[in-house]
Amino acid sequence: MADYIVKDISLADFGRKEIAIAETEMPGLMATRAEYGPQQILKGARIAGSLHMTIQTAVLIETLTALGAEVRWASCNIFSTQDHAAAAIAAAGVPVFAFKGENLVEYWEYAHKIFEWHDGGYPNLILDDGGDATLLCVLGPKAEKDPSILNNPQNEEEEALYAVMKKYLAEKPGFYSAIRAAIGGVSEETTTGVHRLYQMAQKDELPFPAINVNDSVTKSKFDNLYGCRESLVDAIRRGTDVMLSGKVAVVCGYGDVGKGSAASLRQGGARVIVTEVDPICALQAAMEGYEVQTLNDVADKADIFVTATGNKDVITVDDMRKMKNNAIVCNIGHFDSEIQIAGLRNFKWDEIKPQVHHVEFPDGKKLIVLSEGRLVNLGNATGHPSFVMSASFTNQTLAQIELWTNKAKYENQVYTLPKHLDEKVAFLHLEKLGAKLTTLRKDQADYIGVPEAGPFKPDHYRY
């Protein structure tokens, strides 16, 4: 029996062609293969991957295997898989469990499959995006001790998760404790997952060391900012074919993702309004020329609404009842909790095409909801471009190498990659853009108190 679940394995050739193109746009990963591949630095590593199964992720997976690792993979979002990418990786012999449009039970079943190795063994590393794989290693052992904690799901997502976990508790006693004991560390990709890790660490519940990849400068200041700047408008246009020029758009949240989203909409010709709870971010938005208002003040005036906060219930049903007919509502944060989708389920839904729905209120007014409130840039489009993902995924690869080769160095806490690796990731991407670095003279380096070859900034420097 094939050790993969994909939509259509015959898409593998198509996927392989796009992977080949992506490789030319991902210099960091290709340089990492060239540097570490000959020594097979990850030989013996078994990596359970939970991250959007895209063409760019395929290049990451094949970088990990080129470095000697064994890998099993699932997507971290029910809509984000690119089926030709999953097929290409499965055809190459890597077990992949992902297709676009999974239901929630399938999603959590596949999240479990990445821990079930072909020989009955377990993985020893996790590469996570959003923290769901790590969650199983924390919640699972608790449920083994007290199954009653799975009896009261608070939402549709927990209902599916708890159902799958109950099945594993019955069929594989001790499974969760075994995987927790086997894992030597996790590298986490995104803001939401990092937030979960810090919460676990504060409660002394983090079962293994964690590297926060998200807060590498070459991740958060590039992927989150420049990636969203390109992919948000791409998703809205693919989903709706709407003309952005002249429209009023609201971006909820002005962190790195919000900054990229606001820039994306502005470049598309929209007039952008920002909502914020943080006075520093609000001032940044105002100084960039954006209006800063409350959602309550603009709900009935805007044409497009985008959430980018990482919080819950940012746009409520009451907010949506105030919106214009055919206003577009979407989310570019990791989870689907930012828009009150559960409350919208009480109204009439009509699928226009995959990941595009009309939701009709009793008064006849309709909204256009994209990707059911999940990540719009991966649900309605193909996510960030390859080049910016190369920086993020080079950080992920270096984090996996660090966890594998320096296990004794880390305790069960959350760490970031050192500055010299951040600078290395940036350096690997300069040549592709034709950028040339100026070299410090020794007297200049001495004058500002840094090594001639870097690191050039202290850890607390804000880029």
Curated annotation (Swiss-Prot):
Family designation: Belongs to the adenosylhomocysteinase family.
This protein's encoding gene: ahcY
Pathway: Amino-acid biosynthesis; L-homocysteine biosynthesis; L-homocysteine from S-adenosyl-L-homocysteine: step 1/1
Residues annotated to bind substrate: T54, D129, E189, K219, D223
Protein name from the UniProt record: Adenosylhomocysteinase
Subcellular location: Cytoplasm
SUPFAM superfamilies (alphabetical): Formate/glycerate dehydrogenase catalytic domain-like (SSF52283), NAD(P)-binding Rossmann-fold domains (SSF51735)
Keyword Transmembrane helix in record: no
Main location: cytoplasm
Binding residues for NAD(+): 190-192, 224, 253-258, 276, 311, 332-334, 377
One Pfam family cited in the UniProt record for this chain: AdoHcyase
Catalytic reaction list: S-adenosyl-L-homocysteine + H2O = L-homocysteine + adenosine
Origin species: Caulobacter vibrioides (strain ATCC 19089 / CIP 103742 / CB 15) (Caulobacter crescentus)
Record-linked CDD domains: SAHH
Cofactor details (free text): Binds 1 NAD(+) per subunit.
Enzyme class: hydrolase
InterPro entries (UniProt xref): Adenosylhomocyst_ase-like_sf, Adenosylhomocysteinase-like, Ado_hCys_hydrolase_NAD-bd, NAD(P)-bd_dom_sf, S-Ado-L-homoCys_hydrolase_CS
